[in-house]
């Protein structure tokens, strides 16, 4: 028994010697180990990517790819379109006759299909021009229907061949810059199915129905003409006279101290308040040289001058009547009391005028500045 006790005590001492204070873990060391283990576990959880974030990244990548494809397609389409446009002038140069015809047609359609768009200055300059003293026929004083002034021998007139009305060149040029019809009868410069040739141009214009209710104007070849010969145009001029309209339809006309009673034809009577513009019945003609030789822009022409205005403006009739002119046929009336209305049916050319400071034509009002 004593030996066993001694052996047990020796073993116990040996075990105590093996366990030293330095080898035993301290509380601080244990706390550090616990902290490291918790941090490693949390970092491992954060390294995992959420499925929602992954889906958003993939979706944005797909959208970016599709946008890039569309951008490339658009650039390719625009580049191809530019190449086609650049090649079209070369094709038109190969067919000059076809291209010129299309160009004239587009320009004329733009001029005549727009509502009161006016005419181009080149087209206005192509209308016949002559001096008042060159008119052959019964010579009597006539007045310009635009500026209301009497023509003098050296006045330069421009003729509208379709209706044969003539006006001072400055008056009608200003009017045609903002209107495409005659200021007196409101007739168009081109008739349907009528071939009209300008003296200044080497080609004429043919006006016809385009099938859609509009007017189609296309260039036509001008026939050969003798350079020495002159072309004869009919001219329709008139004069202003004061008038009093009676209930029975008779018109008492007075002008220059004369008074007469007659039933005036509506086709040549243009009423302007207490005055009427009466177109003469005499056959007036004028012979014009080709290309209006000798009548190119001459600034020394006598007569009433109207300043050229910007395109889109028109006359104010009441303000034009305020001009002082010793040759005028009118007494000194108040312009504000003078009415001017122009209207008419298709069967007759009767025109009546109203408006104190503007011009009303066929139900449309043209206000002056």
Swiss-Prot record:
The keyword Transmembrane applies. Gene3D superfamilies: Zinc/RING finger domain, C3HC4 (zinc finger). A zinc finger (RING-type) spans 144-186. GO terms for cellular component: membrane. GO terms for molecular function: transferase activity; zinc ion binding. One of its GO terms (biological process) is protein ubiquitination. It catalyses: S-ubiquitinyl-[E2 ubiquitin-conjugating enzyme]-L-cysteine + [acceptor protein]-L-lysine = [E2 ubiquitin-conjugating enzyme]-L-cysteine + N(6)-ubiquitinyl-[acceptor protein]-L-lysine. The chain crosses the membrane at residues 52-72. It holds the Pfam family zf-RING_2. It is found in: Membrane. Its EC number is 2.3.2.27. Belongs to the RING-type zinc finger family. ATL subfamily. This is RING-H2 finger protein ATL47. It comes from Arabidopsis thaliana.
